[in-house]
Amino acid sequence: MRVQSFGRQATLIAGLTVSVFGCSPGEPETAYASSSTTSSTDAQSSQSVSPVKGEALRLVLASSGNVARYRVREQLVGHDLPNDAVGETKSLTGALSIDSSGKVIRDVSKFTVDAATFVSDRDRRDGFVRGRLLEADTYPAITLVPTSIRGVNLPLPKSGSAAIEMTANLTVRDVTRPTTWKGTVQFANGSVTGSASTAFTFDDLLLEQPRVPVLLSVADTIKLEIDFNLVSQP
């Protein structure tokens, strides 16, 4: 695995999301060249694992309430104002393990997104994102491995909310870079729901920035957001 370290880390608004090129309903279709996108795998529910030494809390993604989303600012030919291209998927799995001191247990903490399942409001855009951009047939999984988290304290609160900040290694097409996520969470009887987001450039992950005739411009920044529903695992 190639690991890329970058000096700049952009942090975002709250909202686990990957954003790329879209236009809102009623806008002319963005003319991205379509690629082979027939292969996709359904997300499988997180499997139980044996207790880890030192583990005090294990949170797993529930079977519903989870969305990963990408967002990229673009401006189309013939339009005075730019708009966001947005695609999302509900095909994500994973878990977060924390020890008694509040540190992430990295070996058993990981989230996985099915790269072939992002859907926007335009089929041709989806083909471009899955095919030429993410190469989902070759690299079917986007992974996020948490390395630290702040805002989740033990014992887990039974109610209330908190701001969180998480650092994690994001891997797309076998290129890994550190990211910082900021968001908010709500606690309720052993569950943790909320959203978080980060941002990075195309170059950060060695991705090709789209250049097609119908686009006047595409922002260099990709926003990735995740809405999550985590439940504690005994």
Region locations from a protein language model:
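Sec-dependent bacterial lipoprotein signal peptides
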Residues: 1-21
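Low-complexity, acidic/polar, glycine-enriched regions of mature
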Residues: 23-234
